[in-house]
């Protein structure tokens, strides 16, 4: 694997890359990640089995469109490819620390709101299907938000659970209920990070950074709801966001529907206590 990476990196840079340092670094639960250096420049390398190339290709597109918005900082794409046995993605390496101070948190809130305001997309979805963690995230274009979220988010995850032999509710009935609950909410399509938990943001020398996106055009409230559910963000993050674009009336009820998508996905990936959490959240939503 490493000879292939070094060769492609040399070709991309237009000069020989001589590997003088390679250090394993934290990069989540899915990929094996490294910092590599030629003694001058440093790069962040994600690796996995060869079949993961489709995931890395999707991540490249996610990062591209977020960078195009010129609103938030994301890692710079260098290259991706495969060896005989592995797939890899190379980004610029950035020294990070937690996004835990008030000023930078507020700044990121402002940046996220500007990301959500960017663009003039008329429909909900994305140009490609991508991944939320290790799970395929289908993104066919829809004109109606309620239809998109009910079918391509909630219905999709419930179907994946059913294939595992788990039936929390009648899928068709619950999907129709979600459509009804969201029918009177007509958000403008916003470019979403899509997986905005505290572990996917950081602080670097020149400001906040976000990474590992699962982008699509959807209701901006989905990003905020997930940030609340996972926790870790400073209050100033939410204050910064609302200083630019206050949340709409009804968000407190909609956020449970939006976060159900992530709870279901966590069960489909990790199992365990997320099943009980999903059941309780479904019961809460049905009780409204």
From Swiss-Prot:
Keywords noted in UniProt: ATP-binding, Kinase, Nucleotide-binding, Transferase
Pfam family, one: Fructosamin_kin
Gene3D superfamilies to which the protein is assigned, alphabetical: 3.90.1200.10, Phosphorylase Kinase, domain 1 (3.30.200.20)
Family annotation (SUPFAM superfamilies): Protein kinase-like (PK-like)
PANTHER family cross-referenced by the UniProt entry: FRUCTOSAMINE 3 KINASE-RELATED PROTEIN, PROTEIN-RIBULOSAMINE 3-KINASE
Role noted for this protein: Ketoamine kinase that phosphorylates ketoamines on the third carbon of the sugar moiety to generate ketoamine 3-phosphate.
Protein name (Swiss-Prot/TrEMBL): Probable ketoamine kinase VC_1539
Species of provenance: Vibrio cholerae serotype O1 (strain ATCC 39315 / El Tor Inaba N16961)
Lineage, uppermost ranks: Bacteria, Pseudomonadati, Pseudomonadota, Gammaproteobacteria, Vibrionales
């Amino acid at each position: 694997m490493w000879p292939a990476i070094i060769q492609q990196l040399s070709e991309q840079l237009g000069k020989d890359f001589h590997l003088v340092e390679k250090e394993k670094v934290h990069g989540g639960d899915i990929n094996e990640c490294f910092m590599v250096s030629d003694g001058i420049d440093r790069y962040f390398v994600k690796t996995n089995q060869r079949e993961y190339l489709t995931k890395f290709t999707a991540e490249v597109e996610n990062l591209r469109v977020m960078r195009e918005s010129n609103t938030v900082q994301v890692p710079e794409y260098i290259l991706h490819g495969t060896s005989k046995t592995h797939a890899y993605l190379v980004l610029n390496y950035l020294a990070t620390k937690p996004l835990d101070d008030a000023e930078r948190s507020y700044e990121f809130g402002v940046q996220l709101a500007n990301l959500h305001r960017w663009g003039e997309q008329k429909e909900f979805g994305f140009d490609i299907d991508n991944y939320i963690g290790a799970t395929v995230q289908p993104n066919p274009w829809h004109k109606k938000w309620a239809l998109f979220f009910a079918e391509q988010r909630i219905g999709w995850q419930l179907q994946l659970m059913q294939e595992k032999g788990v039936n929390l509710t009648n899928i068709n009935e619950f999907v129709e209920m979600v459509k009804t609950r969201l029918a009177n909410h007509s958000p403008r399509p916003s470019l979403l990070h899509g997986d905005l938990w505290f572990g996917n943001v950081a602080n670097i020398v020149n400001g906040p950074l976000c990474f590992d996106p699962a982008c699509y055009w959807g209701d901006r409230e989905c990003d905020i709801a997930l940030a609340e559910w996972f926790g870790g963000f400073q209050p100033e993050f939410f204050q910064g966001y609302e200083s630019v674009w206050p949340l709409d009336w009804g968000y407190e009820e909609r956020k449970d529907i939006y976060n159900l998508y992530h709870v279901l996905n966590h069960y489909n990936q990790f199992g365990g206590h997320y099943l009980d959490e999903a059941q309780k959240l479904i019961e809460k939503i049905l009780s409204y």
